């Protein structure tokens, strides 16, 4: 039996520790990572992939994939507790630690202000940004269908981040502070990491690596020097 009251209390405590302004050790970041989490074997295994890209070229220089036994069932609002063990395992495998991590998921744009990007950022003490594909909480004004349509994401009078249409006629991204990155900087860094797709390159690569997509398989054959 999962004690959700205890988890809520932990979320609120950790959320109070999140740094919501820029606190970079390396400016500009020399290496930017993307992190993506998924599940295998009907949820029994949690898989995390982290892709390390050199900035500003956005070339992939390292990737790591970790698989761990899933220790918590799916409970809405508590997904970070289910995902972070695999993220930590992948993080420990990295040879080159990044200066900034874009996480496929929410940062402070969470009912208790602790999505996986914030939770993971606190655990490894690295600047993180949440780049989510769906809204978890908050409201925003309707967006134009054009590329770069933008609106603040707000909840209870607080701006949690940005809703940004990165590509015309595609669903928008929900961008928020994870840890040690301000809201405006979070948006700016995601925009700097775009290369014509809906997703920024770091999380696009992490997703491709985690899913072993054909495009990644072809790329890997051409770049055997990239380390795992």
UniProtKB/Swiss-Prot annotation:
Disulfide bonds: none annotated. The record marks 74 as: Interaction with target DNA. The keyword Hydrolase applies. It is found in: Cytoplasm. One of its GO terms (molecular function) is magnesium ion binding. GO terms for cellular component: cytoplasm. Its EC number is 3.1.21.7. It catalyses: Endonucleolytic cleavage at apurinic or apyrimidinic sites to products with a 5'-phosphate. The keyword Hydrolase applies. Keywords: Cytoplasm, DNA damage, DNA repair, Endonuclease, Hydrolase, Magnesium, Metal-binding, Nuclease. One of its GO terms (biological process) is DNA repair. It holds the Pfam family Endonuclease_5. InterPro entries: Endonuclease-V. Mg(2+) binds at residues 36, 104. Its cofactor is Mg(2+). PANTHER family: ENDONUCLEASE V (PTHR28511:SF1). NCBIfam families: PRK11617.1. HAMAP family: Endonuclease_5 (MF_00801). Belongs to the endonuclease V family. DNA repair enzyme involved in the repair of deaminated bases. Selectively cleaves double-stranded DNA at the second phosphodiester bond 3' to a deoxyinosine leaving behind the intact lesion on the nicked DNA. This is Endonuclease V. It comes from Serratia proteamaculans (strain 568).
